[in-house]
Amino acid sequence: MHAHASRPQARQTTLLRRAALFDFPASADLSPGTEAARHHTIQWLSRFGVFEGHESVAEYDALRFDVLAGLFYPRATGADLNLGSDLVGWYFVFDDQFDGELGSRPEAVARLVADVIRITEEDTAHGRAQDGEGPLLESFRDLWRRISSGRPQVWRDRFRHHWLEYLHSYHREALERTGALPGAGGDAPRSVEAVLALRRHSIGVQPCLDLNEPFGGYTLPPALHGGFPMARMREATDDVVVFTNDIASLDKELAVGDVHNSVIVQWERAGGELEDAVRHIADLANARYRWFEETAARLPALLTEAGADPGTHHAVGRYVDGMRHVMTGNLGWSVRTARYDERGTEAVSGGRQRPWAQLTGAEELIRAGRGAPLPPLGSGSGSR
């Protein structure tokens, strides 16, 4: 009894010890609207049938995705924070669909991705659910409508581009799991850089960053958003979140055999102790974060040299804060969520999946995928 009770404490101690390797803070700057967003998102997902009962709701609630949203958007409240919380919640529900057989069936994954993309192509004012779509797609249609409605076209195009990169990464991960890509499944150890190129998309950070613009009441010009140094700062934000997530989720992913983890890849390549690989990845995260802060300190002068007006200075400052909130907020959530502690590991061990992990009609998708032509992989795979 005593030994069993100590296991969660030991797992939490390991997580906190690893988190202490990061030189940047774990944010506790939580939006005052977080508790309201917590209840809103559970009700929203429940309305579409994502949860089968009270136990499923309780398991989801223990993961506190609302806290992640509240740390990402500490100045947002009301409808804005509710939308951010719904996006984060949907992300993780969607991600959990791939923990079983579906994640190793590229044809089925491609069809699911195509179904989600189809919704992004609909007229947001007149899009209608199709028969048999199910909770995942029906909830996404509602989410997409609320994200897109009333936004500037330049922002909508930006968000959709990032969203498609995120979606296509699931297909590429499935191809890698089955050795269907050149170099995948071979004898040569994978590289951290190659895994990172894919994880920058699958981590889903860029759409979360995009929401900072409508929440803050501004839209960055494409040349500024996509130019130096902002594009590189966004990539550094991706990398810090990826490395943080890979360290926080390491025990869970070792338990389920997930290979898309930079720590595991570093361990495969370098050998030695697992904790040596953890320290190496933490060092990479720290270097990215230091570069980010050094560049952020130079930004006002760079903008002045470029002739930026006060409004642009203010918008860029808000966006830089948004990137910082995502990096530090992700770490703050990672050390307090049940997703990465003993409960989180046991919840996906031994073939078990989350109660909401069967929303895709995976068996039908898998059957439909056999022998049928695939939709195109799209431009989202690989590095930007």
UniProtKB/Swiss-Prot annotation:
It comes from the Bacteria. Pfam families: Terpene_syn_C_2 (PF19086). One of its GO terms (molecular function) is terpene synthase activity. Mg(2+) 3 binds at residues 245, 249, 253. Its cofactor is Mg(2+). Binds 3 Mg(2+) ions per subunit. Mg(2+) 2 binds at residue 95. Mg(2+) 1 binds at residue 95. It catalyses: (2E,6E)-farnesyl diphosphate + H2O = (+)-isoafricanol + diphosphate. Coiled coil: none annotated. Its EC number is 4.2.3.157. InterPro entries: Isoafr/prist_syn, Isoprenoid_synthase_dom_sf, Terpene_cyclase-like_2. Catalyzes the cyclization of farnesyl diphosphate (FPP) to isoafricanol. Belongs to the terpene synthase family. NCBIfam families: isoafr_syn. This is Isoafricanol synthase. It comes from Streptomyces violaceusniger (strain Tu 4113).
